């Protein structure tokens, strides 16, 4: 009976794929009548694979083709598949990826009740690459290189939000510490709006040694701290500067610390400069710092806005006033922004489709 059940499940999986794929091949939209004939499949998760969830992470993962994909799990209403769902189906068909229609309750359980938007994929995991594969870029190659270094960020949603900002603002490389850091999980990918799927993340076992090596090569190692305090003995040892006063004149490593404790003592001691975000009011105890992902966005924008080719104030006004006829520069910037990383409301993105 177990074998018969397995055969039936595999047969229905092929039927689902065939029904969807026929419409996709002929440029049609799979309709409600066709979908209503498909058996709702009670899936058994595949071992050693991850369940990537969310419309944009799954779409970008298929486009990037860095993961092996075992199955696409796709839900659709009676109106059929439209927009990105139809695009997902076409891409899966082109790669011969089985497409199954699971029960909503089953998908909720498999995703541990995360916001999956009715789209999931069973995929191979992504791992950070060794930092030496990031290349041995020297200061003479480009004085405006910016690598983001993460020292022990553990919350997957913080990690994902940081990656999203880094990708959007043009960070060249992201380096993490291998120990005490969040891995590249599906939650990180969803929180990054899929940015994790299209950017390389590197890691090192010796973050302090990495920083010292880059400093010897001429890079500026800039750490980050909360509001300066006279009670902190380390404040007098390393210069502290507002991010608004920082001039980006040579290749820079921007180092962000752990959500709770900030930079470790060893890492902070390897920094040549500490950047801070100054508050605009007197703060009560406990509110002297920002969430690490929020701080990352502010710091990165403050630095990256100095990059040559960053749109000027006049160009930004033109983009806002005449979005239909962008200049050559703004068109290039528009193309550089990856699809799926738009600035639309998060609620709208979560509920689309």
Swiss-Prot record:
Subcellular location: Mitochondrion matrix
GO MF annotation terms: RNA binding; rRNA (guanine) methyltransferase activity; rRNA (guanosine-2'-O-)-methyltransferase activity
Keyword field contains Ubl conjugation: no
GO BP field: rRNA 2'-O-methylation; rRNA modification; rRNA processing
Matches recorded under SMART domains: SpoU_sub_bind (SM00967)
Top EC group: transferase
CC terms in the record's Gene Ontology section: mitochondrial matrix; mitochondrion
Signal sequence annotation: none
Keyword field contains Ligase: no
Catalytic activity: guanosine(1145) in 16S rRNA + S-adenosyl-L-methionine = 2'-O-methylguanosine(1145) in 16S rRNA + S-adenosyl-L-homocysteine + H(+)
Name the record gives this protein: rRNA methyltransferase 1, mitochondrial
CDD domains found in the cross-reference section: SpoU-like_MRM1 (cd18105)
Start and end residues of each stretch annotated as Disordered: 311-353
Chief location category: mitochondrion
EC numbers for this chain: 2.1.1.-
Pfam families according to UniProt: SpoU_methylase, SpoU_sub_bind
InterPro entries: Alpha/beta_knot_MTases, MRM1, MRM1_MeTrfase_dom, Ribosomal_eL30-like_sf, rRNA_MeTrfase_TrmH, SpoU_MeTrfase, SpoU_subst-bd, tRNA_m1G_MTases_N
Keywords for the protein's UniProt record, in alphabetical order: Methyltransferase, Mitochondrion, rRNA processing, S-adenosyl-L-methionine, Transferase, Transit peptide
Family recorded in the similarity comment: Belongs to the class IV-like SAM-binding methyltransferase superfamily. RNA methyltransferase TrmH family.
Function: S-adenosyl-L-methionine-dependent 2'-O-ribose methyltransferase that catalyzes the formation of 2'-O-methylguanosine at position 1145 (Gm1145) in the 16S mitochondrial large subunit ribosomal RNA (mtLSU rRNA), a universally conserved modification in the peptidyl transferase domain of the mtLSU rRNA.
Transit peptide: 1-20
Stored SUPFAM superfamilies: alpha/beta knot, L30e-like
Domain of life: Eukaryota
């Amino acid at each position: 009976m177990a074998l018969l059940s397995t055969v039936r499940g595999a047969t229905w999986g092929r039927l689902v794929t065939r029904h969807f794929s026929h419409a996709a091949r002929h440029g049609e939209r799979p309709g409600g009548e066709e979908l209503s004939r498909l058996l709702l499949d009670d899936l058994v998760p595949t071992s050693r694979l991850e369940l990537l969830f969310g419309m944009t992470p799954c779409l970008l993962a298929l486009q990037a083709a860095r993961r092996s994909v075992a199955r696409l799990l796709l839900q659709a209403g009676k109106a059929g598949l439209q927009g990105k769902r139809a695009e997902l189906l076409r891409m899966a068909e082109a790669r011969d990826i089985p497409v199954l229609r699971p029960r909503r309750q089953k998908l909720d359980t498999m995703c541990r009740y995360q916001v999956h938007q009715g789209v999931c994929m069973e995929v191979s995991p992504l791992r950070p690459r060794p930092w030496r594969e990031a290349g041995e870029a020297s200061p003479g190659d480009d004085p405006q290189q910016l690598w983001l270094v993460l020292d022990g960020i553990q919350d997957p949603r913080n990690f994902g939000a940081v990656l999203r900002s880094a990708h959007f603002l043009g960070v060249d490389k992201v380096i993490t510490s291998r120990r005490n850091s969040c891995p590249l999980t599906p939650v990180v990918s969803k929180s990054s709006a899929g940015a994790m799927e299209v950017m390389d993340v590197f890691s090192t076992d010796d973050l302090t040694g990495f920083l010292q090596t880059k400093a010897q090569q001429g890079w500026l190692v800039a750490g980050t701290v909360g509001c300066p305090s006279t009670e902190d003995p380390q404040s007098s040892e390393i210069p502290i500067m507002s991010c608004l006063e920082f001039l980006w004149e040579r290749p820079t490593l921007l180092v962000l610390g752990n959500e709770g404790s900030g930079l470790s003592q060893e890492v902070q001691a390897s920094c040549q400069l500490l950047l801070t975000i100054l508050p605009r009011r007197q703060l009560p105890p406990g509110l002297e710092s920002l969430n690490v992902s929020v701080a990352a966005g502010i710091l990165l924008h403050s630095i990256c806005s100095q990059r040559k080719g960053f749109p000027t104030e006049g160009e930004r006004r033109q983009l806002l006033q005449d979005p239909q006829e962008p200049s050559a520069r703004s068109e290039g910037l528009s193309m550089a922004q990856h699809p799926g990383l738009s600035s639309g409301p998060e609620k709208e993105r979560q509920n689309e489709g």
